[in-house]
């Protein structure tokens, strides 16, 4: 195991354990009901998720780009083989990416596409679009934005209506951003 992989594993374990400790059965029941049982829930509050990610970033200061996207992927996945993905872990992945959006690159669009496809909840899709993808695209240079536009064009033609909607929203954001950059 490399140093980055060990750090990511320890950070994921820290976040998972903390979220479980912060959970409450009544919130877990409410989330399960709201999401139709598609995702498991620990019952952690949104504030607890944000605080846990903040604490993890303080504890594991050396997370670079690769470590950040590896940790987000670890949190997004199933906590154990055969288990259902957990809403709060996925929300923690979104909060992590929000916190480190400046590290993201156009090449991360494929991973984020996977997150959008498997989100199973608007409570995850909306912040992924507004707080991760839109600022990431806005921070790209011209060449990287052109490459990202190719990916968005593919999303626009995808049969998944969620990806089509994401492409439309993000392309509109990019058009507005590019128009404002050209205006003196």
What residue spans do the PLM features occupy?
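Surface-facing alpha-helical segments and adjacent helix-coil boundary elements at the starts of domains
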Residues: 1-184
């Amino acid at each position: 195991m490399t140093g980055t992989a060990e750090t990511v594993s320890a950070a994921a374990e820290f976040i998972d354990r903390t979220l479980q400790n912060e959970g409450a059965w009544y919130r877990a029941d409410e989330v399960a009901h709201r999401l139709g049982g598609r995702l498991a829930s620990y019952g952690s509050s949104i504030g607890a998720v944000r605080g846990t990610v903040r604490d993890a970033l303080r504890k594991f200061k050396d997370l670079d780009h690769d470590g950040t996207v590896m940790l987000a992927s670890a949190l997004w996945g199933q906590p154990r083989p055969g288990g259902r993905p957990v809403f709060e872990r996925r929300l923690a992945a979104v909060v992590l990416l929000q916190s480190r959006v400046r590290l993201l690159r156009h090449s991360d669009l494929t991973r984020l596409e996977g997150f959008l496809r498997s989100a199973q909840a608007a409570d995850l899709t909306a912040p992924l679009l507004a707080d991760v993808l839109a600022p990431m695209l806005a921070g790209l240079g011209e060449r990287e934005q052109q490459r990202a536009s190719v990916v968005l064009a593919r999303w626009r033609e995808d049969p998944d209506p969620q990806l089509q909607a994401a492409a439309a929203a993000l392309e509109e954001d990019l058009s507005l951003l590019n128009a404002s950059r050209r205006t003196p």
